[in-house]
From Swiss-Prot:
Family statement: Belongs to the D-glutamate cyclase family.
Pfam family, any one: D-Glu_cyclase
Keyword annotations of the record: Lyase
Molecular function as annotated in GO: lyase activity
Its EC number(s): 4.2.1.-
Enzyme class per UniProt: lyase
Protein name, entry field: Putative hydro-lyase Swoo_1731
HAMAP family associated with the record: Hydro_lyase
Signal peptide boundaries: none
Length: 269
């Protein structure tokens, strides 16, 4: 049975995230959001023209581990009221990646000047949302301990293609001892909207990762001898897949720099 929400606890989180979003909106904060406001849901963001939105929606539905869909918004809608008070997707993410013809052309802190009335926003679940549950269970998260971004890798695991959208899964990695890994599986399997259980454990070469010390995105972390790598689906997958499609323009969050919502992580169960 899910524990009742402590209203004072939630109110404290909401005050914290309101202040944090103000600093993000002003451009003062542009770091990774991993570990920030633990207890609240973080979301990967994809923004693309309406003409491509239906196929991308189907892609998310066919690939729920890599692209767990929290919400999709009407064309032109930039205030994401279902995710929180006064959330403006054009300004409230630390950094955005802008892609033109499948190529990342710039990184921005504010995309208000690029906004189009036909843009459709997708909010996808993020593994940062279950980090709090892991910590509550006594598990140490390597990248948080080293104050760095999570390690993310492109794999050889194919997604289920839809229309022009095709490519391989991107994963995030956190090292644990075997016993801790079992506990992490049990915990994260309760959060399907935050990528759920790991898709692979151990032997990175089996999923096409040649070097853990050279992540495709994010930062590398030290892996102790008694630890094994544990891999979860990752919301950077859409960046790779949509880039492969070479559509004229799309925008995403920068890897590791998410939209922090007003929703409690327990609401993702």
């Amino acid at each position: 049975m899910q524990k009742p929400v402590n209203n004072n606890f939630k109110e404290s989180l909401l005050r914290t995230v309101e202040s944090l979003r103000k600093s993000i909106r002003s451009g003062e904060m542009d770091d990774s959001t991993s570990g920030l406001v633990p207890g609240l849901v973080q979301a990967n963001i994809v923004i693309l023209p309406k003409i491509w939105a239906h196929d991308f929606l189907l892609f998310c539905q066919k690939n729920p581990i890599a692209c767990p869909l929290i919400d999709v918004f009407d064309a032109g809608q930039f205030l994401l009221n279902s995710l929180g008070k006064d959330i403006d997707v054009r300004t409230d993410i630390p950094e955005y990646c802008v892609f033109v013809g499948g190529v990342k052309t710039e990184v921005k802190k504010d995309i208000s000047d690029l906004w189009q009335d036909d843009f459709v926003v997708f909010a996808l679940g993020c593994s940062f949302s279950f980090e709090y549950a892991l910590q509550q269970a006594g598990l140490s998260i390597a990248n948080l301990e080293s104050n760095s971004n999570v390690s993310m890798y492109e794999t050889n695991v194919p997604t289920k293609s839809v229309g022009v959208f095709q490519g391989n899964v991107v994963v995030s990695m956190r090292p644990f001892t075997p016993a801790q890994a079992i506990k992490a599986i049990q915990i994260t399997s309760q959060f399907p909207l935050a990528h759920g259980a790991p898709i692979h454990i151990g032997k990175p070469e089996m999923i096409g990762i040649n070097s853990l010390s050279n992540p495709s995105f994010g930062d590398s972390v030290e892996i102790n001898e008694d630890h094994i790598p544990v891999f979860w689906g990752c919301g950077v997958t859409p960046q790779v897949v949509i880039s492969n499609a070479k559509i004229p323009m799309f925008i995403t969050h920068a890897p590791g720099k998410m939209l922090i919502t007003d929703k409690l992580y327990s609401e993702l169960r």
